[in-house]
Amino acid sequence: MITASGGGDTGALRAPGEAPVDVRPQAAAPDEEAGPGGGPAPSRGGSFLARAALVTAALSVAGSLLGLARDQALAHFFGAGTDTDAFLVAWTVPEMAATLLIEDGLAFFLVPAFSLALAQRGRGTGRDPVRALVAASLPRMCLCFAAAALVLALAAPWVVAALAPGLPDQRLAVDCTRLTATCALSFGLAGYCSAALRAHQRYTVPATIYVVYNAAIIATLALLAARWGVRAAAAGVAVGGALMVVAQVPSLVRQLRSGRGTGGSPAPAEPPSTRLRTTVIWTVLLFALCRQSQVLIERFLASSLPGGAISHLNYAQKVAQMPMALALMLCTVTFPVLARAQAEGQTLKARDRVERDVVMAGCVVLLGAAAVIAGAHPIIQLLFERGAFTPEDTAATASVMRVYSLGLLGHTLVGALARSYFAGGRVTWAPVTAMGLGIVATAGLGVLSVGTFGVYGIAASNAIGICLTATLLLRGMGPRTVPIRIPKVVAELAGLVLAAAVATLLGALCARSLTAPVPALLACGPTVLLTFVLVGWSLRVGPLVSAVSALGPALRKLASRHDR
């Protein structure tokens, strides 16, 4: 039901008598600059993007660490048993809502829409197109979000039965689902604010939302876990979702008030195709829904396994996905820049941006995957083995995490490449088709393997399915999207994969030589990092060559300061 939040006819988003707001890219003068009155943000250079990426990375890491603390609290209070499984079925709702409404679906449509409106604002004629877009879309989207939340709450028993038919305590899962259903509204509003702020090149406030969200869940668990049980975690989701909106609204209001506009009638515009804009929304939301349906498949298959299987898979994914989240953070920062380049017809700039983003994201995620696979057991032992979380849970979760991590590069490439397909605001069914084929592969392989390999078969099916999708998306990059140089990108990614494989092997040998988790990680981490950088540098992989080249002058400068 969440897809109803954005799937209607966008012609209905216009107030009576208003001119339509086109979200398709149009050519704009390349020399447009922002005026002091709040026109489109001027073209930002690499230093601005680097600072924005650094701040966003710091806040993303803080949010991820709080996410780990949230999972630690959940493991401490409830372990990896049937109560946790019941909550994790309800947790599917905020997971899907985050993908559809914050991270992928809504952002893939709204960031290009706001980027185009900002480009039109620079012409300084007629009504402010940014305010027109907000007035046309936000009220009706709010109604859609609220309706989706209400339907989810009322349909909770059927949702739980469909997601996990083999779950022992379905009543507890229903209670948790009704509490988490509120995020269909709160996440929708948070995603709207986040997309608008990022299009204005305001990154700090949107990057704080998961810090606020996870802190709220932890606080609610601490206050209510003894009385409400695992329902306290679901209540924390509801509170955290509301706080994500509250954190962003003041900043968005300031951006809208600073916008330049004459306040007159809108300038005449070429009537856009409402059908086209509606199709754009559907392609974006269907892609995001297909991508998130991997979680539904995993939970469905794992519900028939012994108690704790869903929890082991969940904890493994939460840790393994941290490198992916950090890698895609860069793409989140540069997505508005890519959308603006597409809107202004700057194809070469868009191509270079995509190539850099894909290789850099691959570099970050493969380094993280190498560390996660090599140090899986001590990582899980250090993070979760306390309270009701037993050594057997540690061993099972670490093993699943190693298998799941094999698909991290695929997950990252899908996230990075999908932004390239949707940045222009054009209709494209390629991402949906590729994701659909990947989902079919995931489901088919999962059904065939779960009986024999259990949760490991589910994790392996996930990795294979997402890698198939990534391959199809990469092959589909061409003139209708962003015409990147595929052989060049593949060659650099292959070098990074080889570097990660060598680093994983050496890191695992170091980790296994020590039994205590902290010494094992202190030996494993630097080994993985050093090996990855040296092997990648020897293979002349771009980001690592640049990193090593920059390291020499930095060390010499530091040494000269020390000599003084």
State where each predicted segment sits:
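Hydrophobic alpha-helical transmembrane segments
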Residues: I209-R254, L437-T442, V455-G476, T527
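Alpha-helical transmembrane segments of multi-pass membrane proteins
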Residues: L154-W158, L167-C193, F389-L417
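Interhelical loop/hinge segments that connect adjacent transmembrane helices in multipass membrane
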Residues: D9-R14, E18-L49, A247-R291, G308, ...
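Transmembrane helical elements of multi-pass membrane transporters/channels
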Residues: R51-Q72, G240, M244, Q248-Q255, ...
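Short membrane-interface helical motifs at transmembrane helix boundaries
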Residues: A148-P168, A370-P391, V447, L509
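Helix-loop junctions and terminal segments of transmembrane helices
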Residues: E103-G122, L328-T347, A418
